Design a protein with these regions (language model features):
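Short amphipathic alpha-helix used as the core "switch/output" element in two-component signaling
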Residues: 75-86
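Two-component/phosphorelay signaling modules centered on CheY-like receiver
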Residues: 24-43
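Hydrophobic/aromatic residues positioned on beta-strands within the core alpha/beta folds
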Residues: 92-93
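Acidic catalytic/metal-coordinating carboxylates
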Residues: 47, 73-76
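Non-catalytic signal-transmission and effector/linker regions of two-component phosphorelay proteins
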Residues: 1-16, 119-136
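Acidic, metal-coordinating helix/loop segments flanking the phosphotransfer/catalytic sites
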Residues: 44-62
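The feature encodes the CheY-like receiver
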Residues: 70, 98
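As written
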Residues: 74, 105-112
């Protein structure tokens, strides 16, 4: 197995990304943005079921995941993806900018949250290199 690493002030940065969002337009924009920042977008998925299948196929080391998905919400999907793809860095996103409590982030195994409208200006390498969130 080959690990793709990008240097950062953290020891590991996810570089092979799965995008999960029910909006095809957002997935396309996010894929373009991630590619411009040096990430490899492996696959895109529109819901939790597609995301789990994509994880089984491509084993991403990072996942950009919408909180508001049809069917299971993004928090439940994040927990399922973390169990299916141990070690993947999960970054939650949403058009809703409300703060996600650390306890919720820890429970669903996400490492960060970024509002969709802030994605273009976010330091994605730092977001995808964060260690798991502690509720302490």
């Amino acid at each position: 197995m080959v690990f793709h690493l990008v240097r950062s002030h953290y020891s590991y940065v996810a570089s092979r990304i799965l995008i999960v969002d029910d909006s095809a337009r957002f997935r396309a924009l996010a894929a373009e943005l991630l590619a411009m920042r040096g990430f490899e977008v492996l696959e895109e998925a529109a819901d939790g079921e597609q995301a789990l299948a994509a994880v089984a196929r491509s084993r991403p080391d990072g996942i950009l995941l919408d909180v508001n998905l049809p069917g299971q919400d993004g928090f439940a999907v994040a927990a399922s993806l973390a169990a299916a793809c141990a070690g993947a860095r999960i970054v939650l996103t949403s058009a809703d900018t409300h703060h996600v409590p650390a306890e919720v982030m820890k429970t669903c195994a996400a490492i960060a949250f970024v509002a969709k409208q802030d994605l273009a200006v976010a330091d994605l390498k730092t977001l995808f290199s964060r260690p798991p969130i502690s509720a302490d």
